[in-house]
Amino acid sequence: MSQSREGFESDQATLKVYDTKTSTVFSVTQGHDTSLEEIAWSSDEKGLFFTTHRPGFLVLGYISLKGKDLEYLVEDRSVIGLTVGPNNDVFFEASRIDSLPEIYRYEKTSRELSQISHVNKKQQEKWVFGQLEKIKIGEGDRQTHGFVVLPPGYNPYRQYSLLVLLHGGPRSAWTNQWHHRWNPQVFAAQGYVVALPNPKGSIGYGQEFSDAVRLNWGKASMGGTLAFTKHLQRRSDIRDDKTCAAGASFGGYLAHFINTRSQLFQCFISHAGIFNLDLFWSTTDRQWFPEWEFGGVPWLNKEVYEDLSPSSAIEGFRAPTLLLHGQKDFRVDVSQSIAAFTTLRRRGIPSRLVYFPDEGHWITRPQNLGLWYEEVHTWLAKYLR
């Protein structure tokens, strides 16, 4: 895998092959506007299987060494963990927002997909899942694609509170995939309509769309997020006076950024969210990351850092905010949430800080994850019910 822009972790990843006989390197995916994630040689060594982000899914694909068109094999669920067996059979884990993870086999010769594990069968049959809707608003450069998860037992004649989840990254995306963190079904089960927008900066929509957030954090992603939210608030089944936004890492940063500039939301949740970009540069374990995103070091790009930092717009803070953070977070230091909490409290805005002394950037311990969800549910219930 090869990237052309030094210091940019989310640059387009091109697949290249080194020919040991001719000592030459050739590109297999040149000309395709996509980045490959996992790759695995086919059993006949004539091509490679891969996963890549497409709108709303992490799909399974195949490309021959001749460099022809990418062939997408499984596009109706999200795929991870490729293993190739004999006869070009591919084994992997696949899931959807309403379908728990299982192991599948894709037979390339017959083009048949079969489920070979049933470890989550009892849970799948027992649990009631909310219905999933695909949403796309706008066109071209202004489009925002995403999902909506309805509460179980949804009644179109009722009105529901709205929870907008903000993904991290910023170069990431909400996909139709099951995950234990920020699981939309868990929130939908509380009686909320859950929105999963993929605004500018999201992956799976072309490199230009992903690149749009550089030197424009917050502003680029906020536009699509607000448009997506307003689109849903105009629906008859949504209460426009009961809306909360929540996210982690960049999503937590975006929550702070929107809170200083919009009155669309009644509450926010920020997990490991960036509050002060100068402080972020000086405390993160990856200084090259903000230097790429904001065009260099803070003292030489003061205007960019200040313009995009939520801490520069403290007067705009208005909505109650729940903050959560782990002490062992080396990506976004815990001082970010402490600073945001202190500022919110000093401004007289209802806020709460939940501190995990034994967690890092993500909450990974089951007991802590249970507490995390409990705190989040309690906060949402206070402002959305």
Which role fits each region the language model picked out?
Residues 19-23, 63-68, 107-111:
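Short loop/turn segments that connect beta-strands within beta-propeller blades
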Residues 6, 111, 119-241, 248-249, ...:
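Cap/lid segment of the alpha/beta-hydrolase catalytic domain
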Residues 196-385:
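Active-site-proximal cap/loop segments of hydrolase catalytic domains
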Residues 1-16, 27-36, 51-61, 75-77, ...:
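A flexible loop/linker signature enriched in serine peptidases of the S9 family
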Residues 44-46, 87-88:
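Short coil/turn segments that connect the beta-strands within blades of beta-propeller domains
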